[in-house]
């Protein structure tokens, strides 16, 4: 199974695409029934680049799977780059993360105390 995390290093994403399962026929052609691996890669490439299947087939005509898998991997790396960069920026800002944690903890405590007060009233305990 080919798994990609949106936050993986670009070289890891490329390596996984290069290992993607394809068939022995080296023709890049959309045929989900007979070429499911290649067809899946074509779907990914189409989403990442906006190209239709006919354009993809024409682009890689006669090239084999090696260059196609590399192109798919590179297009996914570029598609995910803004997400990865923003995540890295946010994770590097410790004061921002602490403020988010603190705000979340305060909200959770408020909601928990309201719920606990309702439970105390229903059960008949004295309010805290």
PLM ranges: what are they?
Residues 3-128:
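Conserved nucleotide- and phosphate/pyrophosphate-binding catalytic cores
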């Amino acid at each position: 199974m080919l798994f990609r995390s949106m936050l993986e290093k670009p070289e890891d994403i490329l390596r996984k695409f290069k290992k993607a399962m394809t068939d022995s026929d080296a023709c890049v052609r959309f045929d989900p029934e007979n070429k499911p691996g290649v067809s899946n890669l074509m779907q990914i490439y189409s989403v990442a680049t906006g190209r239709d299947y006919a354009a993809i087939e024409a682009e890689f005509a006669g090239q084999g799977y090696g260059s196609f898998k590399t192109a798919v991997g590179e297009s996914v790396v570029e598609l995910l780059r803004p997400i990865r960069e923003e995540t890295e920026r946010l994770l590097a800002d410790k004061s921002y993360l602490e403020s988010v944690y603190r705000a979340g903890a305060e909200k959770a405590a408020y909601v928990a105390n309201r719920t606990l007060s309702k439970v105390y009233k229903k059960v008949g305990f004295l309010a805290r």
